[in-house]
Amino acid sequence: MGASGILQLPRERFRKTSFFVWVIILFHKVFSIPLGVVHNNTLQVSDIDKFVCRDKLSSTSQLKSVGLNLEGNGVATDVPTATKRWGFRAGVPPKVVNYEAGEWAENCYNLAIKKVDGSECLPEAPEGVRDFPRCRYVHKVSGTGPCPGGLAFHKEGAFFLYDRLASTIIYRGTTFAEGVIAFLILPKARKDFFQSPPLHEPANMTTDPSSYYHTTTINYVVDNFGTNTTEFLFQVDHLTYVQLEARFTPQFLVLLNETIYSDNRRSNTTGKLIWKINPTVDTSMGEWAFWENKKNFTKTLSSEELSFVPVPETQNQVLDTTATVSPPISAHNHAGEDHKELVSEDSTPVVQMQNIKGKDTMPTTVTGVPTTTPSPFPINARNTDHTKSFIGLEGPQEDHSTTQPAKTTSQPTNSTESTTLNPTSEPSSRGTGPSSPTVPNTTESHAELGKTTPTTLPEQHTAASAIPRAVHPDELSGPGFLTNTIRGVTNLLTGSRRKRRDVTPNTQPKCNPNLHYWTALDEGAAIGLAWIPYFGPAAEGIYTEGIMENQNGLICGLRQLANETTQALQLFLRATTELRTFSILNRKAIDFLLQRWGGTCHILGPDCCIEPQDWTKNITDKIDQIIHDFVDNNLPNQNDGSNWWTGWKQWVPAGIGITGVIIAIIALLCICKFML
């Protein structure tokens, strides 16, 4: 019995110790404490790149289509410049494709253009085509134009992105963003019972104050849309307008709207009042911030700083019919082709959304009800005469703006809107040159995309690019996906020459790294811990706080790589063209055959003086730049025998955790031994 009791004592202690060990294991499983936590400051783009390269496509469900906005490449987004990228063409059927996720857009557009006879220029959106769901600013343009016929395509071959549908044409009264469709291989998401249920689909306009974004609508009026006399006016109300220039940022227009309201600069009669901003006024306010950084404006505007300049009737004529343009038609009651089946009703999110901190307000319409406290100054007789002098109903009168007394600055009082308005600045895509105060701002003509009907859209785009047209200087320097490629080929086809070795480094930001995605599910579906297995079954239980940021960095890097590769290919194309011309001449053989007639140059004359320029240095510099940016950045060693997962550094927290568990077990054994 004694021996039996002695043998039973360790067995009882072992049972108690095992109980505590199983409690620890179950606690770890229930709460999914990760063995290693990768934070934002430790996970680099190279690490993510290595994970992506190690992942394999196991099923077609991992292939996701994502819409990438052109504005992420740094293209100009102001209305006068953006509309130059669109043009009408007849005989080309539209194409519609679906995609699963898209970027949050800073600038979206909504067009409602009519002909002079009142007929519509743009087709009605088919059933299933809805507004782009994530827009910081919606530029709503209404007015008239000749509309040469056909449909409105993108001259540079891009898509018009709607809600999970990308079309090659613009639909009337439907908000869209410019972009392209990319296909990404994403790892399978592990299904877990803690996963949040699907919520409502994303939308721009919402009455939910808990939404993580804020949309502002800016209204414009256009006259002679698509011609060489196109004139855009920023609409303050139905009688007050401001002559629009490419240098005006959305933030400037929002503050300009508040200033006009607070300083009583609106038309107080039945006629139209058109203002023109002094060309010396600095309008480059704001910065790339998107929704995650709700920063206040660093400056406010006053009437003295703006220096309003009157525009006489003879230099600006706005059609009276523009104020009565019918409102946009809903995108849910459409005739024609039905694209509803292309949008999945229960599509799963491609990328988990981050919980954007900060309080937001309801969407704002710039031309809506005034949101600032009116100026205490009454509209006196002088102000009334001053306003009547510029209303477009009478002839040009004396300019009283230079003699108007200065006013006390009236600051806007709507602090909520100023905190939620998102600063954005695009200095590389804005024109800063002064404009004449007496010449109305005009845009270039929308040239037709060509008369030959291509079989596919890329062919149509190439034919369009071959048409010589004036190009804005800022467009030439834009680091876009398609813009540099097409314009470079256009320069070759139109005979534009380039000085040898004149490639200069681009000091402007090549793309905006702050990219966020929207999916079929609302951001609320990702609140809390995101259960995301990281690229493979070996990393089960690992999660990261920096997934979104590093994936954004990857996309930005891919954009840079594509941009630099495109520039190198442009040089290759030109070098090939010149070498081909030179090889056709093949002077040595031809001179030998034509010696008795004086040689090639004697027969051909100046045409034989074609010397292929040496572009090797330029091409080599571009390739070296690509190697420096994307190859020399050493990645973790895949062949490390001790690292079959994510690198030995990732095992440091895991080792600490395992060591802690071992110490806890030893402590429990000691406690149990002394207790028993």
From Swiss-Prot:
Site (Cleavage): R501, D502, N637, Q638
GO cellular component terms given for this protein: extracellular region; host cell plasma membrane; membrane; viral envelope; virion membrane
Pfam families in UniProt: Ebola-like_HR1-HR2, Filo_glycop
Region (Mucin-like region): 305-485
Region feature Disordered, mapped onto this chain: 356-463
Disulfide bonds listed in the record: C53-C609, C108-C135, C121-C147, C511-C556, C601-C608
Ranges facing Extracellular side: 33-650
Keywords associated with the record: Clathrin-mediated endocytosis of virus by host, Cleavage on pair of basic residues, Coiled coil, Disulfide bond, Fusion of virus membrane with host endosomal membrane, Fusion of virus membrane with host membrane, Glycoprotein, Host cell membrane, Host membrane, Host-virus interaction, Inhibition of host innate immune response by virus, Inhibition of host tetherin by virus, Lipoprotein, Membrane, Palmitate, Secreted, Signal, Transmembrane, Transmembrane helix, Viral attachment to host cell, Viral attachment to host entry receptor, Viral envelope protein, Viral immunoevasion, Viral penetration into host cytoplasm, Virion, Virus endocytosis by host, Virus entry into host cell
Post-translational modification: The signal peptide region modulates GP's high mannose glycosylation, thereby determining the efficiency of the interactions with DC-SIGN(R). N-glycosylated.
Transmembrane annotation, as ranges: 651-671
Lipidation (S-palmitoyl cysteine): C670, C672
Annotated positions for site Involved in receptor recognition and/or post-binding events: L57, L63, F88, K95, I170
GO biological process terms held by the UniProt record: clathrin-dependent endocytosis of virus by host cell; entry receptor-mediated virion attachment to host cell; fusion of virus membrane with host endosome membrane; symbiont-mediated suppression of host innate immune response; symbiont-mediated-mediated suppression of host tetherin activity
Low complexity composition-biased segments: 361-374, 423-440
Family: Belongs to the filoviruses glycoprotein family.
Domain notes: The mucin-like region seems to be involved in the cytotoxic function. This region is also involved in binding to human CLEC10A.
Function per UniProt: GP1 is responsible for binding to the receptor(s) on target cells. Interacts with CD209/DC-SIGN and CLEC4M/DC-SIGNR which act as cofactors for virus entry into the host cell. Binding to CD209 and CLEC4M, which are respectively found on dendritic cells (DCs), and on endothelial cells of liver sinusoids and lymph node sinuses, facilitate infection of macrophages and endothelial cells. These interactions not only facilitate virus cell entry, but also allow capture of viral particles by DCs and subsequent transmission to susceptible cells without DCs infection (trans infection). GP2 acts as a class I viral fusion protein. Under the current model, the protein has at least 3 conformational states: pre-fusion native state, pre-hairpin intermediate state, and post-fusion hairpin state. During viral and target cell membrane fusion, the coiled coil regions (heptad repeats) assume a trimer-of-hairpins structure, positioning the fusion peptide in close proximity to the C-terminal region of the ectodomain. The formation of this structure appears to drive apposition and subsequent fusion of viral and target cell membranes.
Protein name, per record: Envelope glycoprotein
Organism of provenance: Tai Forest ebolavirus (strain Cote d'Ivoire-94)
Taxonomy of the source species: Viruses, Riboviria, Orthornavirae, Negarnaviricota, Haploviricotina
Encoding gene, per UniProt annotation: GP
